Amino acid sequence: MAATSLTAPPSFSGLRASRAVVAMAGTGKGGAFTGEISVEQLKDIGRWVILGHSERIVVAYEPVWAIGTGKVATPDQAQEVHGLCR
């Protein structure tokens, strides 16, 4: 499971500790990092952590057949791939 910092505590109630996986953005030791979760806080929650800022990632898509050809995907084609990514 890769829960956000807002959903992690309620999500853990139904999981055994050995299966829990936590995904949150971690910061360095100490300091004031508004909106971030510290390493010390992460260690208290679970055994596994996905580090980084995946909530801030933007995914762009262009079909292989369209690259450098001047052809573009239709809105329906783009929506189909968007659905698969989600």
Curated annotation (Swiss-Prot):
Any one GO molecular function term: triose-phosphate isomerase activity
Cellular component terms per the entry's GO annotation: cytosol
Pathway terms, separated by semicolons: Carbohydrate biosynthesis; gluconeogenesis; Carbohydrate degradation; glycolysis; D-glyceraldehyde 3-phosphate from glycerone phosphate: step 1/1
Pfam families: TIM
Active site: 62 (proton acceptor)
Reactions catalysed: D-glyceraldehyde 3-phosphate = dihydroxyacetone phosphate
This protein's UniProt keywords: Allergen, Gluconeogenesis, Glycolysis, Isomerase
Biological source species: Platanus orientalis
Entry's EC annotation: 5.3.1.1
Protein name: Triosephosphate isomerase
Keyword DNA-binding assigned: no
Family statement: Belongs to the triosephosphate isomerase family.
Subunit structure comment from the entry: Homodimer.
GO biological process entries: gluconeogenesis; glyceraldehyde-3-phosphate biosynthetic process; glycerol catabolic process; glycolytic process
Domain of life according to the entry: Eukaryota
